[in-house]
Amino acid sequence: MSPAHPENWPVLVVKGGVDDELLRDFTALAAAAEESDGNPPLSEQTFVTLRAGESGTHSLLSLALYAPDEESDPATAQDLAGFAVVVEEADGTGVLELAVHPSYRNQGVADRLVATLKASRGFDGLKAWSHGNHEAAADLAAKYGYAPIRELWKMRLTASDAELPDAALPDNVSLRAFIPGQDEEAWLAANKAAFSHHPEQGNMTRQDLAARMAEDWFDPAGFLLAVDPSGRILGFHWTKVHPGHGGHPAIGEVYVVGVTPEAQGMGLGKALTVAGIKYLQDKGLHAVVLYTDADNTPAVSLYRRLGFTRWDADVMYGPKNGG
């Protein structure tokens, strides 16, 4: 490893989609960071966007900081010390996520990336995630005038904690699995209606859905739809299974639960939540996790009644002045 300070290391700035080699480098570093920290440094949405490339709703800005070998030309250095990715929305706002390889921490790598980002893009409309609420991320955010604006709780239910209540579906509502090639448009409409208050989820496009369906983890059997006698989708529970790694067992996730406005107030949300958890438990998974905003008191209360406890938190940072 070079003793040179990171301020002298080359930073590759890529606007638009990344090539396969850079994506492999990002994926390998992210895996090393997750193994060290216990949390993935990138959200699933960011990885989906990186793999799928830019779309009509998202554009990309990526920065990669390479640590030059003492014997090599810095322009061709191979050691990726850290990277940053900004997913830009059509309205000009963006979300930053950043990762530093465990071998290169406490050397100013993150600061170099953020300084380069400030010079190349600026901070207008920019927010940032820290997955796992790391102290180093909080210090870096404060240095650049950012403060916490949102806290996303990761809650967990283990098999030993699980005493799920009976939660029958409402009358004239049945449950079935998502059928690829048939249900995409109907589900997108139901999702948009269910999350009209949550544009991050509600604005999902056919391309976004296709990208998720192309992921290795996608299994239509765990994508549960609640339908009325006419077949109309009233709600859904999309589950996910994270494969085991590094000696850790596979774990299930309450990926997203939604209920359309006309079906709310019937207990369908609770019934769908319980049905999805039972589906995951029947697959032999030792634990189930979910994400919810810390200030969503009704959701937190429901999940606690089901046996979930707070496990970790992700923190979003924004400018202190609200800019």
Swiss-Prot record:
Binding site for 1D-myo-inositol 2-(L-cysteinylamino)-2-deoxy-alpha-D-glucopyranoside: E44, E200, K240, E253, Y291
Known catalytic reactions: 1D-myo-inositol 2-(L-cysteinylamino)-2-deoxy-alpha-D-glucopyranoside + acetyl-CoA = mycothiol + CoA + H(+)
Binding site for acetyl-CoA 2: V257, G258, V259, Q264, G265, M266, G267, L268, G269, K270
Biological-process GO terms, alphabetical: mycothiol biosynthetic process
Keyword Transferase attributed: yes
Primary enzyme class: transferase
N-acetyltransferase domain: residues covered: 173-323
UniProt entry keywords in alphabetical sequence: Acyltransferase, Repeat, Transferase
Residue numbers binding acetyl-CoA 1: L98, A99, V100
Disulfide bond positions: none
EC number: 2.3.1.189
Complex and partners: Monomer.
UniProt similarity note: Belongs to the acetyltransferase family. MshD subfamily.
Stated name of the protein: Mycothiol acetyltransferase
Taxonomic placement: Bacteria, Bacillati, Actinomycetota, Actinomycetes, Micrococcales
Gene that produces this protein: mshD
